[in-house]
């Protein structure tokens, strides 16, 4: 069987959906299935078996900025690839994202499986409901990565959704060396209000001087937050880092913090952190609380509350059970 897996987002820019697509493709190949990933790439493809569809364009979506490829040149590259590859099955992710995914569904040269990742209200689902339903009706099997994602899709489009949770490649994250950085907190995610980075930075005011904070990635809030924290030597700004460095940091840090304010349907990075041996401190939002079994597998705090976050971080860093 030959499967074409289509990403709406740039595969060279870190993101939960992109990581899931690349990991799933590798897992299927290990089972002897021929998989090719098609998607935008802003630079050399990050893995083998990828057909680049050109550069991405920053596009506002779900309270964030996504690296999509809605331009005509990307659609022409996709059409050419579908014609040449002749896939037996297409697996599209975020089926209503502008760009190659919708193009593939409209053309429909093979049976289609679609996976919905996003959760929460969507203006595009609301404004373009009729054409969105037409597109969705061309899909044979609809999947969602969480109940929240399924509810979002069902409310907008109707239909049935099989919930297939995200997964990770455990061997890549398993802790191979002892923890090396005591009293260290790691954050990775786009620097924008929805991800709650500013809440985390405010919480540092309540923590002892020995606590270190590593901040990876970048975004529209980066320069402002760097300026506001330029006198705090405890905070290290890492910029965009490779997947390998992300895993290394997860394995070295004392705890991983996910302070998102909302809009998270699953939170795969929490799985990555737990698999790496890091304690997780996360906001008490549906996408995180269900993943952590109501807080049994993480310390949860009220989203947006920097004081509550500081208390959770201090508990994770200093109470004996947290290091076990």
Give the role of each language-model region.
Residues 41, 148, 167:
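Carbohydrate-associated surface elements
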Residues 151-154, 165-183:
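Acidic anion/phosphate-binding donor-loop and adjacent secondary structure
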Residues 294-295, 299-306, 315-321:
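Conserved acidic donor-binding segment of nucleotide-sugar-dependent glycosyltransferases
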Residues 223-247:
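Nucleotide-activated donor-binding/catalytic signature segment of Leloir-type glycosyltransferases, i.e.
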Residues 279-282:
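Short hydrophobic beta-strand element within catalytic cores of glycosyltransferases
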Residues 176-208, 213-214:
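Conserved donor-binding/catalytic core segment of Leloir-type glycosyltransferases
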Residues 6-14, 21-72, 80-81, 219-220:
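N-terminal strand-loop element at the rim of the active site
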């Amino acid at each position: 069987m030959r499967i074409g897996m289509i990403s709406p987002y740039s595969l060279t820019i870190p993101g939960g959906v992109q990581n899931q697509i690349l990991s799933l493709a590798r897992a299927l190949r290990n089972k002897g299935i021929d998989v090719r990933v098609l998607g935008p790439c802003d630079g050399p493809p990050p893995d083998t078996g990828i057909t680049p569809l050109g550069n991405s364009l920053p596009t506002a979506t779900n309270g964030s900025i996504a690296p999509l490829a809605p331009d005509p040149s990307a659609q022409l590259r996709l059409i050419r690839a579908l014609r040449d590859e002749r896939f037996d099955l297409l697996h599209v992710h975020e089926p209503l994202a502008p760009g190659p995914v919708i193009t593939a569904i409209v053309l429909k040269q093979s049976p289609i499986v679609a996976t919905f990742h996003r959760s929460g209200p969507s203006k595009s689902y609301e404004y373009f409901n009729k054409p969105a339903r037409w597109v969705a009706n061309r899909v044979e099997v609809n999947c969602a990565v969480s109940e929240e994602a399924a509810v979002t899709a069902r409310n907008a489009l109707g239909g049935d959704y099989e919930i297939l949770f995200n997964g990770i490649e455990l061997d890549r994250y398993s802790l191979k060396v002892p923890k090396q950085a005591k009293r260290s907190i790691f954050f990775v995610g786009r620097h924008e209000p929805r991800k709650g980075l500013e809440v985390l930075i405010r919480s540092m005011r309540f923590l002892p001087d020995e606590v270190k904070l590593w901040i990876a990635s970048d975004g529209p809030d980066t320069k402002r937050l760097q300026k506001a924290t330029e006198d705090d030597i405890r905070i290290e700004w890492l910029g965009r880092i490779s997947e390998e460095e992300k895993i290394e940091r997860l394995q070295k840090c004392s705890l991983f913090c996910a302070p998102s304010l909302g809009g998270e349907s699953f939170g795969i990075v929490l799985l990555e952190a737990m698999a790496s041996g890091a304690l997780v401190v996360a906001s008490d939002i549906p996408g995180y609380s269900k993943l952590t079994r109501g807080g049994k597998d993480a310390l949860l705090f009220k989203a947006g509350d920097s004081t509550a976050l500081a208390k959770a971080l201090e508990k994770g860093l200093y109470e004996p059970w947290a290091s076990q």
